Amino acid sequence: MNTIGLVVNSSKGDVAKPVREVISWLAEQRIKVLYNEESAVLLGCPEEGISTRELGAQCDCIMVWGGDGTLLNCARQTASSGTPIFGVNLGRLGFLTEIDIPDLRERLQALIAGHFYIEERMMLEATVIRGGQVVDQAVCLNDAVVSKGASFRMVQLRILVNNEFVGSFAADGVIVASPTGSTAYSLAAGGPIISPDMEAMLITPICPHSLSNRPIVISPQSKVEVQVLPYVDKVGLNLDGQYGLPLREGDRILINRATVKARFLKIQKTGFYDVLREKLKEWQNGLD
């Protein structure tokens, strides 16, 4: 482990001091640290920043300071390089960010000593076809969501799986999620929880007008097609709640398992069900 990339969500409070301390400690261990652009600005050296995508190409692993959202963004941008990432938690307990700042130095010592393993997560690829032409294509880790956005009107959608008609319905939208994404928006919309070590896809309608429209778990080899039917107001595609694209009547959105995977560097054995149990307690008790 010679070079570590650094991605910091600078909106998560005053983190510059602990970040600098970790960088200094890594330098003592002869570990080189590269920064993405936002992190370089935070540290007062904007000229040294490179894109997160470039970090993936130049580093052995990437250390992400933030919450699950920051980690999702990094996973999308570095998926093509296959560089493993790990999260330092700056907020509430997350499903993906597993290291707290007080434990970080101990975990980094284990990392440098080679005491880690790589956990791979299935990703999705979404392709937007308009007038027979591909107008956008991107990968996501959690979910691809076709929804009405800020409009008050429902959208009319048609769903096919492997070119087989599943159904048409009026709803606020539809979520196509990975197992990792099953504990995100899909769960709030009534979808089931899928263990992240499985490979599957999940189709979850968002507030459908009919009670007969239920979530469906399908094979990871499946190809999902969402068609935007006439008489829609405003509808858009959103990936991981971060990357968005306005859609038009007649657009076809194709969603399938991506050829790349998110790779998480695990320094400690954290059980998914331990984290799930704590998150469910948190949601039950409400947020402060």
Swiss-Prot record:
Pfam families: NAD_kinase, NAD_kinase_C. GO terms for molecular function: ATP binding; metal ion binding; NAD binding; NAD+ kinase activity. GO terms for cellular component: cytoplasm. Its main location: cytoplasm. The active site is at D68. It is found in: Cytoplasm. One of its GO terms (biological process) is NAD metabolic process. Keywords: ATP-binding, Cytoplasm, Kinase, NAD, NADP, Nucleotide-binding, Transferase. It is an enzyme of class 2 (transferase). The keyword Transferase applies. NAD(+) binds at D68, G69, N142, D143, R153, D172, Q242. It catalyses: NAD(+) + ATP = ADP + NADP(+) + H(+). Its EC number is 2.7.1.23. Its cofactor is a divalent metal cation. Involved in the regulation of the intracellular balance of NAD and NADP, and is a key enzyme in the biosynthesis of NADP. Catalyzes specifically the phosphorylation on 2'-hydroxyl of the adenosine moiety of NAD to yield NADP. Belongs to the NAD kinase family. This is NAD kinase. The lineage of its organism: Bacteria, Bacillati, Bacillota, Clostridia, Eubacteriales.
